[in-house]
Amino acid sequence: MPQSNIHPGSIIEPGAKIGKNVTIEAYAVIKGTVSLGDNVVVKSHAYIDGNTTIGDGTIIWPSASVGTKAQDLKYRGEKTFVEIGKRCEIREFVTINSSCQENSVVRIGDDCLIMAYCHVAHNCEIGNRVIMANNSMLAGHVVVE
């Protein structure tokens, strides 16, 4: 059975759930109640926080920031979620914020490519097989099918 490869220079908080055959590179940070599916790769300096679930086979590239606090003045610390589907690529310097209303979800479907420097704001929903080109930005509550 394949073993996970977790670099000793990464930071993983005790609440995280790590699937099978996961790779976490040096200086990656996993905080909160993050759940990584099987065969996930988290590259160096990626930052994953909050109530975030990342599906099997997804790759989080260097310096991506996933599950961080919503950039919305209405957000007051409610429990919110981020869900990223299977086989996605979240490229360099992408930011994916959490939602801003109690028990709401920012959702990215399966087989998506979110290219470098994209931003996905609070309460967005992205369907399956979506490609966001470099520097694309979604404001809050946007749905892309």
List each language-model region with its residue ranges:
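Structural signal for interior beta-strand "rungs" in well-ordered beta-sheet cores
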Residues: S4-E145
